Each structure stands twice: as structure tokens, then as C-alpha cells.
């Protein structure tokens, strides 16, 4: 197919190559016809930074930015590239990568914190907008927080009040973001051999926020220069995200809004109506309700 260009001569995206969806293809072509700039056209026009794509540009201090591009002929012998502070290409790449991990973990985990705060508010009966919709899921996750679901009465086990269980789970769940000691509770959900491997390599997260903060600390100028140690902290923060903030958000949302189940629905650009004001809500933040 011939290269597409707009009236100014800028390269345009091929609608068929940009998306497999016919509706999206149609609207990309329409946007181009109307002269509307889209992400697809900008991607076709913009050449990625050759140094940035290798992760070897450091902007962590005011002496830089330092660029350590690979020589065109490659590296023969020892890699002697260093930034002004002495950071190697490996160190710079590791710093940049784990800062991206910190950003992603912060976004995921702060979503989970918001859910936990709403859950706590619902458990305290501070709002009528949210209630426990899936008590069975609450009973299923309670043991992971060392919350008893039954109480002994005259030698017989009786079910505890669901509101009492919810309040105790909520308080302990919210504590996972900033507790001073121990490790994340949900780590024990992993298969035992995997958990032991995490413990042996020293990457068990202590709490969610601490691992994100420690990445920002270690990647600051004059702190950690060992790329292996930096990547180790990146692993720890990733586990804090996946087995902490994200998993807590999933479970608490299930309790608050009901555990999801498969359903059939229509979803595409064709659901929009020409004679209506179309409002599209996108995302996975149910507490916006």
C-alpha cells in the first residue's frame, strides 16, 4: 500500500495496519479525512529516541543528562562507558527500569488503597453507598488476615457477625500499605517452593509503600550504583504490587461489589448513537461509582 500523507505532507498511519477492528479502521480513516490528529498518526510520524530506547539516558541529577550510547560497531572488551557520577550503562538502565516499576506499582497499589479505605468506611457503617455484597468472599479471605470467622460459645463454634469480620479484615488490609514489621500477608498464597525461592533471594516485600519509596531512594544520586541490587529492589516492589496492592484491590472489590462472573454484552464504537450525548467510562476504578 502506498504511504499515506495528509495535506501538509506528514506521514499517516495505515488504518488497516493500525487496528484489526473494522470500526476502528473506519474512524481512523475518517479522522485523517477531517484532519484530526490521532495517536496512530503520531506513532507513524515520530521516530523513537535511539538512546532512550536503550534505557541509557540518565536525568537523575542537575549535572546531566548523561547519555551513554552504544558505539555503532558494538563494544569490544570491557564496557568503559560511565556518566559524570560514575554510573555505568547497566546502572543507568536499571535505575530507569525500576523507576518505571515504582510508577506502575504506585498506580496499582494506590488504587488498592482507595478500595481498602472505602471498604473500611463501609465496614464502619460510615456510608450507605457501599455494603458487603459477597459475604462468602469475605469469609474466604478472612483467614489470610488471621481473622476468625467463628467464635466459641459454650464449647460450640458459632458464626461471627459478618460486620465484625468485615471491620477486622478492613483494618488489617489497610495496614498492609505501611506496617512497620513483617511481610505482606498474601505472599503465603504463592506455591510453597516459589515462596521459599523469594525468601532465599531476599525479595519478600515488607509492606507496599516501603518498597516503592525505597526504589526512589536507591535511584537518587549518590546512593545505589549496583545494577544487580537495583534490580533486586525492582523485583521486591513488583511483588508488593502483584501480591499486595493489586491482589488486595481485587479481593476487596469482590466483597464490596460482588465477585464477577461471565456475561454477554455488546461493546464497540458501534454502541455510540449519533443523536445522543455519548459518555464513555473507561477504567477499573469501581469506587468512582
Task: Give the location of each predicted region.
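Metallocofactor- and cofactor-centric catalytic cores in central/energy metabolism, strongly enriched
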Residues: 2-289
Amino acid at each position: 500500500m502506498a504511504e499515506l500523507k495528509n495535506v501538509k505532507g506528514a506521514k499517516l498511519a495505515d488504518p488497516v495496519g493500525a487496528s484489526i477492528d473494522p470500526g476502528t479502521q473506519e474512524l481512523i480513516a475518517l479522522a485523517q479525512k477531517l484532519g484530526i490528529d490521532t495517536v496512530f498518526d503520531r506513532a507513524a510520524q515520530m521516530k523513537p529516541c535511539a538512546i532512550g530506547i536503550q534505557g541509557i539516558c540518565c536525568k537523575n541529577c542537575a549535572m546531566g543528562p548523561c547519555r551513554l550510547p552504544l558505539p555503532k560497531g558494538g563494544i569490544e572488551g570491557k564496557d568503559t562507558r560511565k556518566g559524570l557520577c560514575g554510573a555505568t550503562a547497566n546502572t543507568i538502565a536499571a535505575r530507569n527500569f525500576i523507576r518505571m516499576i515504582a510508577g506502575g506499582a504506585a498506580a496499582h497499589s494506590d488504587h488498592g488503597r482507595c478500595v481498602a479505605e472505602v471498604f473500611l468506611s463501609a465496614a464502619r457503617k460510615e456510608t450507605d453507598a457501599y455494603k458487603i455484597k459477597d459475604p462468602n468472599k469475605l469469609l474466604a479471605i478472612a483467614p489470610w488476615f488471621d481473622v476468625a470467622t467463628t467464635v466459641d460459645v459454650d464449647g460450640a463454634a458459632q458464626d461471627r457477625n459478618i460486620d465484625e469480620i468485615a471491620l477486622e479484615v478492613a483494618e488489617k488490609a489497610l495496614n498492609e500499605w505501611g506496617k512497620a514489621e513483617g511481610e505482606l500477608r498474601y505472599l503465603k498464597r504463592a506455591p510453597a517452593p516459589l515462596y521459599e525461592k523469594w525468601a532465599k533471594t531476599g525479595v519478600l516485600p515488607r509492606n507496599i509503600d516501603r518498597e516503592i519509596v525505597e526504589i526512589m531512594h536507591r535511584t537518587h544520586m549518590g546512593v545505589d550504583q549496583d545494577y544487580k541490587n537495583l534490580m533486586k529492589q525492582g523485583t521486591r516492589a513488583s511483588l508488593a504490587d502483584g501480591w499486595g496492592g493489586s491482589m488486595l484491590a481485587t479481593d476487596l472489590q469482590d466483597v464490596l461489589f460482588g465477585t464477577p462472573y461471565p456475561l454477554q454484552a455488546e461493546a464497540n464504537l458501534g454502541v455510540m448513537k449519533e443523536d445522543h450525548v455519548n459518555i464513555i467510562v473507561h477504567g477499573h476504578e469501581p469506587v468512582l461509582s
